[in-house]
Amino acid sequence: SPVIFAGGTFNGHPLTMVAGITILKHLKENQEEIYPYLHEQGNRIANEINEFCSSNNIAAQMMNAGSMMHLIFSGDTIDSARDIGRSKIEKEFYLHLLGHNVIVPGIHLAFISFAHKPDIVDKVIDAFKKSFEDLREDGYL
């Protein structure tokens, strides 16, 4: 019989498969509550960060699609991936953000989940603002 390789830490593991099916059922059963909340909180983070950057003359913008966000260090209009560049400021920003207890993966896409309630979202927004202030103190802005 043919063998199928499924690479990854838990790919194809029966327990992982049950957990995946269970969460998908939960998301479907609660979609009227979960997805609007995620979009609302993702938009809130992006809007507050963008307002902060605009009012503090910081050339950065938070782009989001619901609960997925990406901070771009440019004040210019972003039309394609070619408009996004990596900079030393970006590296320093994420180090400061980590120092304020917010972890963003190396690809610099931030995500929130339904577990991130408004008080946690407030802390995330505050950490972003403090990280921008840290950059300014360090002479990057």
Question: What is the predicted role of each segment?
Answer:
Residues S1-L141:
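Conserved N-terminal phosphate-binding loop of PLP-dependent enzymes in the Aspartate aminotransferase
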